[in-house]
């Protein structure tokens, strides 16, 4: 495969590639199969808002006519949250149940992990007045560490500035030291760290999620 990679706006024909990359890399570059095997449900939760409701804020990295990575961006996190809660989330859950999710032990372990996370404070809180936009990046194996993440962020950051928004936030794994260093190099600063419980074998392990923020004043 050649080395020429192009960063460009998302197109509708990229949808399946973006969805496949999402579940195949979501666990710090690894597949989500350790936690949940319903790839459609995972892709719906991770990408459907961005591909179907806000495609103009989605950027892809393309090499030899194949999508090798993406940045899902959002200019209005309040709107994204509403769409997720009212439309995407309920539909994804209902369809997963229809495919037999309730009969799999992994589903109940994941649900219990979410419940334990909620008892520890739940999802990280973000000041959406200061950081209304957000982003998430995933790259295929073999295309990390080549400057593609930097280029994707720079394209999205220009979009945010052109719209006059004050800042961007992102949520990442607390234990992803490489990813955290990258975001810090890109000018993002740590805003908060929140406990996270995940299934591990027949038990659970405690880790964390971290929130990083960037403003045009930083």
What are these regions (language model features)?
Residues 6-20:
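A short beta-loop-alpha structural element at the N-terminal edge
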Residues 26-46, 85-93:
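Conserved GNAT-fold acetyl-CoA-binding loop/helix
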Residues 36-58, 63, 72:
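Active-site rim helix/loop that mediates acceptor-substrate recognition in acyltransferases
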Residues 78, 171, 184, 189-204:
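Conserved catalytic-core motifs of GNAT/GCN5-like acyltransferases
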Residues 78-136:
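Conserved acyl-donor/pantetheine-binding loop and adjacent beta-alpha core of acyl/acetyltransferases
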Residues 131-133, 160-172:
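Conserved GNAT acetyl-CoA-binding A-motif
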Residues 134-144, 170-180, 196-198:
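Conserved beta-strand-loop-alpha-helix junction that forms the acyl-donor binding cleft
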Residues 136, 145-159, 181, 185:
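Conserved acetyl-CoA-binding loop-helix of GNAT-fold acetyltransferases
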């Amino acid at each position: 495969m050649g080395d020429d990679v192009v960063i460009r706006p998302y197109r509708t024909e990229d949808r399946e590639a973006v969805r496949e990359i999402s579940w195949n890399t979501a666990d710090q570059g690894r597949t989500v199969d350790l936690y949940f095997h319903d790839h459609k449900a995972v892709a719906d939760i991770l990408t459907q808002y961005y591909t179907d409701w806000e495609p103009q804020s989605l950027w892809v990295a393309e090499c030899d006519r194949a999508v090798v990575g993406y940045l899902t961006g959002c200019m209005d996190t309040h709107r994204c949250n509403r769409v997720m809660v009212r439309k995407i989330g309920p539909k994804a859950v209902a369809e997963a149940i229809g495919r037999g999710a309730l009969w799999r032990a992994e589903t109940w372990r994941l649900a219990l992990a979410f419940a334990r996370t909620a008892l520890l404070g739940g999802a990280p809180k973000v000041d959406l007045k200061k950081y209304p936009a957000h982003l998430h990046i995933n790259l295929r194996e073999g295309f990390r560490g080549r400057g593609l993440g930097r280029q994707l962020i720079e394209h999205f950051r220009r979009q945010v500035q052109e719209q006059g928004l004050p800042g961007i936030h992102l949520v990442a794994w607390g234990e992803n030291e490489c990813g955290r260093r990258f975001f810090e190099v890109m000018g993002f600063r740590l805003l908060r760290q929140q406990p996270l419980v995940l299934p591990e074998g027949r038990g659970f392990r405690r880790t964390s999620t971290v929130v990083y923020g960037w403003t045009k004043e930083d």
